[in-house]
Amino acid sequence: MLKQAILNIVALVSALTCAAEAKVEAQSTQSQATIIIAADEPTKTYDPMIFGGFIEHLGKQIYGGFFEPGSPLADAKGFRLDVIKAVKELKVPVIRWPGGCFVDSYHWQKGVGKKRQPYDDDRWGVLEPNTFGTHEFIELCRRLGAEPYICQNSLASIQEMADWVAYCNATTGPFAEMREKNGHPEPFNVRFWSVGNEKVGRGYIDKVRDTAEAMKKVDESILVTCSGSHGPRADIDPYLFKTAGKYLDLLSVHEYWIPNLQEHHAPDYLSCMMLSEKPDTHISAVVKSIDEAGMRGQIKIAFDEWNLRSWHHPGFSGHQPRKVDYQDPEIIALIKAREKSLEPSLYTMADALFCASFYNACLRNADDVTMANIACIVNQTGPLYVHPKGIVKRTHFHTMAMYANMLKEHVAKAQVKSERLTYGSSSVAMVDAIATVDESGKKWAIAMMNRHPSKEVSCTLKMGELLVDGIYEATVLTADSPDAYNDIESPNRVMPKKIALTFKEGITSLPPHSLVIVDVLIE
């Protein structure tokens, strides 16, 4: 039993006080919480695809991110070896590409073969050289150990979309021959395909039906998704399920809780924490729509673009083409403004804890959410900042690494009794938790977070009715402020370190703005 338990505690923590002007209400001087793990009840298996990533041909995600031919840090093929090494730490199981709204002007045949066809993406104001195409994407995925997930241009013809599936997966025929001529005789075996990105309307839904049918005729083993919801509205048009439901395996859901596309926002830590329960409510609303359509269990959720913050891309809607003169001072200024998303000071402990909150929501809904892709994985708002001379691991990089590497295979019920953290008219639970266990039922990993910016929380951890007790090793992600961040000058300001942590009669102290993952081995 628990008398023989061995606990290794790994914690993502940051340490001191919030800004003096922050107004936080709590019920008592010593905040308290209790976490009760249902250790003897049935568990459910989650899909590690929830730790996926997304890359788009915008904002130095690919060019100047993963792919930088001529860089001293790149190999002969142009892949940044330092970036690949870092992302492999995250065990990213799936990468979605090439968009995003960028895909609305993307035609895959221009990005294969020796003679690539550059073009001007006038929806986003991007000059696309097409040197990174299907073959390069597949090679990147193979190097990362990730499955490729291709998002189709739904404005293209149905035939063009079906042909891309054939180019990637066919073993015989003209597109298999074309792929072999371009250097890859073996099929790529791409499983995941999306019909379009962030589209709505019955015309789109009809095209989803016809395209999904055509793609599955090429390869019946593929898994097909389409646009379900994007933005704060999570309800789904019932016509989608009625018309295309039988062809769908996944439903694409997108949300960025701080919209930055046209106007740039940098809310404080507490404002960000007030958003940290939104993923739970968003997922619940999507599940409700699927359930009402009678397709819960058949169609799963792919939350294939998510982040606390969206990137800044002013002056371009991504939907309407416009004439772009790249010598125009106004266009130059708009393109320059995109770099605001790269500002290191944006990515604080708020991002680290929101990231954990999002994963907790996915894990709680493991029966319904089978994929999630942080947007994006490098540069812009991603966990890894890439610059010409190296990389910086942002705060949420460490959250992702901890979750991807430490959690066990199954999710158990965890009841959390916690005070509320209040800011203005909003509030969230001060403490959140998730519990996972391995196949044997003996090895547990329990994640606990304290969202309070400046107060420790006295937290009781119980496995059923039994209390965890003793002094245990811990890995702690420490910072000197909830607003701490990593940058080129101080890349290790927020990073893990080992400490000793005490549980006395089940009680430990959760530091301010912290996430703690506790490993429990029951012999």
Residue ranges and their predicted role:
Residues 1-28:
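Bacterial Sec-dependent N-terminal signal peptides
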Residues 255-271, 316-318:
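Active-site His/acidic residue clusters
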